[in-house]
Amino acid sequence: MKLLSKLILTLALATYASASESFRYINWDNPPHDVTFYEGDVLQFTTNEGRNSTITLISDTENGDKSFDGVLNEDQRSFVQKALPPGRYTFKDLNSGSKSIIRVKESKELAKEVRPIDRLKDNADAANTENAQKSPNTQSTQKGSPKSDAKEASPKTDAKEASPKSDAKEASPKTDTKQGSSPKTDTKSSTQKPSSSSDSSKAKAEANTAANNEEAEHVEKGASNTLKASLSIISAACVLSLGYLL
């Protein structure tokens, strides 16, 4: 029995050692160059969320079809697209047997980098063509602009040649005012009008002050009358109280 148990233990250790030797761990955060995959290789990488993940290689065929253990999630799919060398990769679940095939090509990543640059170049070329089309229109407008024609025959020079100011100077109405009645008397009469208005305002102010004084006198008289009445009532009450006591 002891011999059988020892044999079983040795066989188990041998199988475990052989199995452990068949699994080779490859860190794909810093992937090696020109790597060849073998059966049992385990690819280790860090996901976008910072978790550690692994993909196990099941078989490596001659035509480049590489089969891995497990169904791919989004992180593993992006990992395969970026990290693995070009080839056709088959990922299958050992329990369910479902498969997912991914083909990795170098041109796919290059196209993503080239397309935005090409779009920017196309936009720049389109903008240059638009500017080139607009530029001859502006030159034509500058060559035959109506402003230059207006300057050549402007109505301002005609107005200066025959300005009405010189005619007004020749026959100015000032000499007529000197010969006739002077306008100074009119200005005096015009200045007398505001003085009359000021007199009326003064009269109104005096009337208001007089009315206010009369109201104040009435108030003072009313107050004195109330005081007198209250004093007479108090004196009468005192007399009555004294008479009652006596």
Curated annotation (Swiss-Prot):
Residues 1-19 form the signal peptide. Keywords: Glycoprotein, Repeat, Signal. Residues 113-124, 146-177 have a biased composition (Basic and acidic residues). Residues 113-223 are annotated as: Disordered. Glycans are attached at residue 52. Sequence repeats lie at residues 145-153, 154-162, 163-171, 172-176. It comes from the Eukaryota. Residues 181-213 have a biased composition (Low complexity). Residues 126-145 have a biased composition (Polar residues). Residues 145-176 are annotated as: 3.5 X 9 AA tandem repeats of S-P-K-[ST]-D-A-K-E-A. This is Protein 3F. The gene is pspG.
